[in-house]
Design a protein with these regions (language model features):
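Terminal and linker regions of secretory-pathway proteins
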Residues: 1-422
Length: 422
C-alpha cells in the first residue's frame, strides 16, 4: 500500500495553492485550466482543471477535473466523492485512482498506470462546503444528507454548464465510504433530471446501513481471529437470542460491556481498521490510547462502525430504512457495490447483507472474478449479480481499494462503465 508522509496535507495545500495561482477566477473552463502542476517531471498530455462551482445556495464547491486520456468527447463523465463525511475527494485524486499520485518523498508526483481517467473523464468534487477548499458565504457549515445531495446536484449542473461539451456524455456517480449515503441520495435527484445522461452508480466500501455494519463487524472480527472463544461465547450468551444477534442497539448491560471490549480490540489495540493486514503508519505506540490506527498518518477518516462509540450521533435504523428506499429508485441503472474484504471501517459482510436486503432477483450466483496481474490471471475477488446490482469483493484490499489493489480496481471500474461482465 502506498505510504504518504506526515506532511501530506501541507504538500497538498502547496499543490493547490500553486496550481490556483495559475488560474483566473473570471472564466471557466479556460480560466480554470491548470497549465503547470508542481511535482511532475513532465506535464500531462491531457487537459485538467481546478476551480470553483458557484451555487445559488451560497456554496462554492472546489473541483478538480481530469479529461480522459482516451476519447474525452465520447468517454463517460464520472463524478467521484470521498466520504467521511468530511474527507476531501482530492484523497481519491492524489492517493487512489487519479492520473498522478503523491510519492513517498512527499515532494513529487508520479503518473498512475491504473488511473481511472485512462478511460473516463473524472470530476473530483470537494463536498460538502467546508471540506478542503470548498466554502460557504455565510460560514455556516452545519448540513445534512438532503442538503448535501441538493448541493452536489447543483454542482454537477453547474459543471455541465461550464463544460457543455460533456452535457450529453454518459454520467456515472461514484464514491467511497460515506459515499454509500452521498451517491444514492444524489442519484435520486439526478435521475429526475432528463438533461443528465445518468447511466449508473458505484460505491466502494460504503456506509449503507449502520445497523448492518455494526452487526456484521462483530462476526468479521471473530472469524478473523480477533476476539477469542471466551469473548465470543459471552457475546452469544448476552447479545443473541435463538440464533439472532443484535450488536447494534442491544440494551442488555452485559452485552454492552462485551461490545466495549470488541470496540477496544478493533479500534484501540493497534490494528489498522482500514486494512486489517496492513501495518499502522508510524508504528503502534508503546502506550495505546483510544486513538485509532490509520493506514496513513495524515489521512483521517471518520469511524462509522461502533454504536458504542458513536451512539450519540446515530439514529436507529435511519440508514437502513431511508437509504434502502433510495436504492430502490435505481432499478433501471447499472449499480455496483464493491468492497475490499479486509476493511473493518465498512466491512464487506454488512454491505453484502444490505444488497441482499433489497430482495432483487439473483441473475448470477456468487463466483470468482479474474483480472490480469503481473503473473497472469489472478482472482480479484467474488461477485454476485442481481437484477441491476452487482456486489463485488476485492481480495486482500482494505477501505481504499484503488490504493491497495490498483490493477484489480481498474479492471473492475473498466467493466462497470463499459457494461462488460465482471
Amino acid at each position: 500500500m502506498r505510504r504518504v508522509q506526515t506532511h501530506f496535507l501541507v504538500l497538498l495545500i502547496h499543490f493547490l495553492s500553486a496550481g490556483l495561482h495559475f488560474l483566473s477566477v473570471e472564466a471557466a473552463p479556460a480560466g480554470d485550466e491548470i497549465t503547470y502542476l508542481p511535482g511532475l517531471s513532465k506535464q500531462p498530455s491531457f487537459k485538467h482543471y481546478s476551480g470553483y462551482l458557484d451555487l445559488a445556495t451560497g456554496k462554492h464547491l472546489h473541483y478538480w477535473f481530469v479529461e480522459s486520456q482516451g476519447k474525452p468527447s465520447s468517454d463517460p463523465l464520472v463524478l467521484w466523492l470521498n466520504g467521511g463525511p468530511g474527507c476531501s475527494s482530492l484523497d481519491g485524486l492524489l492517493t487512489e485512482h487519479g492520473p498522478y499520485l503523491i510519492q513517498d518523498d512527499g515532494a513529487s508526483l508520479d503518473y498512475n498506470p491504473y488511473s481511472w481517467n485512462k478511460i473516463a473523464n473524472v470530476l473530483y468534487l470537494e463536498s460538502p462546503a467546508g471540506v478542503g477548499f470548498s466554502y460557504s458565504d455565510n460560514k455556516n457549515y452545519k448540513t445534512n444528507d438532503t442538503e448535501v445531495a441538493l448541493n452536489n446536484y447543483l454542482a454537477l449542473k453547474t459543471f455541465l454548464k461550464l463544460f457543455p461539451e460533456y452535457a450529453s456524455n454518459a454520467v456515472f456517480l461514484t464514491g467511497e465510504s460515506y459515499g454509500g449515503i452521498y451517491i444514492p441520495t444524489l442519484a435520486q435527484r439526478v435521475m429526475e433530471d432528463s438533461a443528465i445522461n445518468l447511466q449508473g452508480v458505484a460505491v466502494g466500501n460504503g456506509m449503507s446501513s449502520y445497523e448492518l455494519n455494526d452487526n456484521s463487524l462483530v462476526f468479521f472480527a471473530y472469524y478473523h481471529g480477533l476476539l477469542g472463544t471466551e469473548l465470543w461465547a459471552g457475546l452469544q450468551a448476552y447479545c443473541c437470542d435463538q440464533g439472532r444477534c443484535n450488536f447494534y442497539d442491544n440494551r442488555n448491560p452485559n452485552c454492552s460491556e462485551l461490545l466495549g471490549d470488541v470496540q477496544t480490540i478493533v479500534y484501540s489495540s493497534g490494528l489498522n481498521m482500514y486494512n486489517l493486514y496492513s501495518p499502522c503508519a508510524g508504528g503502534v505506540k508503546d502506550t495505546l490510547r483510544s486513538v485509532q490506527c490509520s493506514s496513513n498518518a495524515t489521512l483521517v477518516l471518520t469511524v462509522y462502525s461502533s454504536t458504542v462509540l458513536l451512539k450519540h450521533v446515530m439514529v436507529s435504523c435511519r440508514g437502513r430504512l431511508i437509504y434502502r428506499h433510495k436504492y430502490s429508485y435505481l432499478q433501471k441503472y447499472r449499480v455496483l457495490v464493491y468492497n475490499g474484504d479486509v476493511d473493518m471501517a465498512c466491512n464487506f459482510m454488512g454491505d453484502e447483507w444490505f444488497v441482499e436486503s433489497l430482495k432483487q432477483l439473483v441473475q448470477v450466483q456468487r463466483r470468482v472474478w479474474l483480472y490480469e496481474g503481473a503473473d497472469g490471471k489472478q482472482v480479484g475477488g467474488f461477485v454476485k449479480e442481481f437484477s441491476n446490482i452487482a456486489f463485488l469483493t476485492i481480495k486482500g484490499s482494505g477501505h481504499m481499494v484503488p490504493t491497495d489493489k490498483p490493477a484489480a480496481a481498474f479492471t473492475m471500474f473498466s467493466r462497470f462503465i463499459r457494461r462488460e461482465p465482471y
